[in-house]
């Protein structure tokens, strides 16, 4: 925190000379009479009853209302930022710095409040509806309605607009093919009504560049840059919203003033850095354009050269080199332009000032974000490839280097192993294609005493395994005692009714919470350390058994006990946890699983490690996608682990615990380090501090002859909600 505090005085705002605080005099234009969610719902209802003019009216109003609210929010935030200009604090007493800082915050807040709606929640879109607008769903309704009222040109534009963002939509593709064959439909009718100006201009510039029309290329690329910074300003302004709690974290969030400010400000900065990706993304395309902003100057320097403008060519080359100073080709180009123009004329030409300012601001933001990643465990994934290495703290650089080297080594060795397996598969020509799924499985468990009891074949599925002997009887008892002790100490969700059934209670503890309670002497510290080590043990077993090419990262983990409520068991027909899929929303009637939020789409593998079997019910079972046809059942017992991939191939549930208490460690993993658990980073650091060792004790059990497994991830992001297996 100490490195952040000196920066605070630089952020002081004031709205003119000292004076009384008050709301701004300026007021924004009125908000739409109806919020976009109500208009969208009205349009959908009109569609259902076939009232096509009403569909057009309501959906068009919904689109305009959402755009107006967003534009109003951007205008308001930018106006308030401009009205509270930065003032230097040099020469002031140090004791006044904090007061001036918060005085500026109050002025900004008063300004924002003055232009906000009287009922802000009425105009705030929920996640689901925001997703519908991002998917351009209103245009799906509109294209049908326009066609029904014989406005074919508008129908074509709406269909094209929807298809640009949904290129896999088969029906819309067929509609567009039909429109192309219709008489009177022009090519210009196929317009993207949601096209972003900066991307449109960039594409035009690149097209003219490819067609060797440098003058036209320059015109559109320069326009693209202007529009880019307009879009960047708007995107960054929209980041300054309320704090986004992750899952159920708000129930346990407990931070002091500076921790809360840090958490929120880092979230805002991370969002603003994410505008780089947002502005480089194209609807319907999975990956954004790499190095999007610098690439403008790569095109421009050569276009200006072909146009005979060496001054501008030098300016753009030097600007590009701000991002990639060691680019060999660009340095050669710059040397050539300088030689042609002359050293005396070329030397005074500087990179563009607005790009210098952009780069400086971006690097300062990255320094703060990497610092918070290193010190507080708040993850940050840099969207740029041009960031200088020295911006990243040395300790974090070393961590990332070790992770990359370990991942590369494991990938290479697994690749060699897979080549051997592929050779075996080719030799067995008579085996079915399904066999390849099982061949990937079956790697060593890497720990003595552990053995595979059931594999995918015996569990009637794919990417499934049951392992016994993961824990000893004494370790199971010790971890059960830890759960009860942590519940007595209080961890935020002890003794609550289960979120999945009113007939059971549950309580539990996360790894970090257990370690903190151990540090405070409220639970045995060695038991908390055992809990940490056991989760690492399961992770390494999963990586090795499923022969994963990249490391697994913890997405969420907790030790939880479910207890049957005796008086609520009579006539009980529900499950302890109904059938579900861990990374998608299961629609059992349609036999589909939709991989989109609010599902935890980033989860790739799941595991549950049982601590006991002395209870009634509580069996774990797999089903088909219909959630009814059971394919396999696993009875819990001490030291038994069930591991499986988290996708639609593995719907699963937990049968009712009808008597006694069932305790287990539930673990979810991700292959994407951006979604790894923030608490895990803090737990890793706490273990190193408490036990003064660089390696977890259990890792020493792995013999030198066995296959290497993935290194422990030190990346971290958010803790998911308290969901259970």
Curated annotation (Swiss-Prot):
Subcellular location: Endoplasmic reticulum
SUPFAM superfamilies documented for this protein: TPR-like
Ranges of Polar residues composition bias in the record: 701-715
Active site: 662
Required cofactor names: Fe cation; L-ascorbate
Residue stretches making up the Fe2OG dioxygenase domain: 557-671
Pfam families xref list: 2OG-FeII_Oxy_3, TPR_leprecan
Reaction(s) this enzyme catalyzes, per UniProt: L-prolyl-[collagen] + 2-oxoglutarate + O2 = trans-3-hydroxy-L-prolyl-[collagen] + succinate + CO2
EC number(s) on file: 1.14.11.7
Protein name according to UniProt: Prolyl 3-hydroxylase 1
Designated gene of the protein: P3H1
């Amino acid at each position: 925190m100490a490195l952040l505090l000196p920066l605070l005085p630089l952020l002081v705002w004031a709205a003119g000379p000292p004076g009384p605080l008050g709301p701004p005099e300026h007021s924004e234009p009125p908000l739409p009479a109806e919020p976009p969610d109500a208009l969208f719902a009205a349009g959908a209802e009109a569609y259902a009853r076939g009232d096509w003019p009403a569909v057009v009216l309501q959906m068009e109003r919904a689109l305009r209302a959402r755009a107006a609210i967003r534009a109003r929010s951007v205008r308001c935030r930018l106006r308030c930022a401009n009205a509270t200009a930065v003032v230097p604090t040099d020469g002031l007493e140090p004791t006044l710095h904090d007061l001036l800082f918060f005085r500026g915050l109050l002025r900004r807040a008063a300004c924002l409040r003055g232009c906000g709606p009287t009922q802000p929640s009425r105009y705030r879109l929920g996640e689901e509806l925001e997703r519908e607008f991002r998917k351009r769903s209103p245009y799906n309704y509109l294209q049908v309605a326009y066609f029904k009222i014989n406005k074919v040109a508008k129908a074509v534009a709406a269909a094209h607009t929807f298809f640009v963002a949904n290129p896999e939509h088969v029906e819309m593709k067929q509609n567009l093919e039909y429109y192309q064959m219709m008489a009177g439909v022009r090519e210009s009718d196929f317009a993207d009504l949601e096209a972003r100006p900066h991307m449109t201009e960039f594409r035009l510039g690149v097209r003219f560049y490819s067609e060797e029309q440098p003058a036209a290329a320059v015109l559109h690329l320069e326009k693209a840059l202007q529009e880019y910074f307009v879009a960047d300003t708007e995107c960054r302004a929209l980041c300054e919203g309320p704090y986004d709690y992750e899952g159920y974290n708000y129930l346990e969030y407990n931070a002091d003033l500076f921790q809360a400010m840090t958490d929120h400000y880092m979230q805002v900065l991370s969002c603003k850095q994410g505008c780089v990706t947002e502005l480089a993304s194209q609807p319907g395309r999975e990956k954004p354009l790499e190095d999007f902003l610098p690439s403008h100057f790569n095109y421009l320097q050569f276009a200006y050269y072909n146009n005979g403008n060496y001054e501008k060519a030098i300016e753009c080359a030097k600007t590009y080199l701000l991002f990639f100073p060691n680019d060999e080709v660009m340095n050669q180009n710059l040397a050539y332009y300088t030689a042609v123009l002359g050293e005396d004329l070329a030397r005074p030409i500087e990179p563009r000032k607005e790009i210098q300012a952009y780069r400086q601001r971006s690097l300062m933001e990255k320094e703060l974000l990497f610092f918070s990643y290193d010190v507080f465990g708040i993850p940050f994934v840099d969207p740029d490839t041009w960031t200088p290495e020295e911006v990243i703290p040395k300790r974090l650089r070393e961590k990332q280097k070790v992770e990359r080297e370990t991942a590369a080594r494991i990938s290479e060795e697994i690749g060699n192993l897979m080549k051997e397996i592929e050779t075996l598969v080719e030799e067995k020509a008579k085996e079915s294609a399904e066999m390849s799924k099982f061949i990937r499985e079956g790697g060593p468990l890497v720990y003595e005493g552990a053995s595979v009891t059931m594999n995918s074949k015996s569990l009637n599925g794919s990417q499934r395994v049951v392992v016994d002997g993961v824990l000893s009887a004494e370790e199971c008892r010790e971890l059960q005692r830890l759960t009860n002790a942590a519940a007595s100490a209080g961890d935020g969700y002890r003794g609550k009714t289960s979120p999945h059934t009113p007939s059971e209670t549950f309580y539990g503890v996360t790894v970090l919470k257990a370690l903190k309670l151990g540090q405070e002497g409220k639970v045995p510290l060695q038991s908390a350390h055992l809990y940490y080590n056991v989760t690492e043990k399961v992770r390494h077993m999963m990586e090795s058994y499923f022969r994963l090419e990249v490391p697994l990262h913890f997405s969420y983990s907790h030790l939880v006990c479910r207890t049957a409520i005796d008086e609520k068991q009579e006539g009980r027909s529900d499950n302890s946890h109904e059938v579900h899929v861990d990374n998608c929303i299961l629609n059992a009637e349609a036999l589909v699983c939709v991989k989109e939020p609010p599902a935890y789409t980033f989860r790739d593998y799941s595991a549950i490690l049982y601590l006991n079997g002395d209870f009634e019910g509580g069996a774990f079972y797999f089903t088909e996608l219909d959630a009814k046809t059971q394919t396999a059942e696993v009875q819990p017992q001490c030291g038994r682990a069930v591991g499986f991939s988290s996708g639609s191939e593995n719907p699963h549930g937990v049968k009712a615990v009808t008597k006694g208490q069932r305790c287990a460690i539930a673990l979810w993993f991700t292959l994407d380090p951006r979604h790894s658990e923030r608490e895990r980073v803090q737990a890793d650091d706490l273990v190193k501090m408490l036990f003064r060792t660089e390696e977890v004790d259990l890792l020493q059990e792995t013999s030198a002859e066995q296959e290497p497994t993935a290194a422990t991830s030190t990346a971290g992001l958010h803790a998911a909600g308290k969901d259970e297996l």
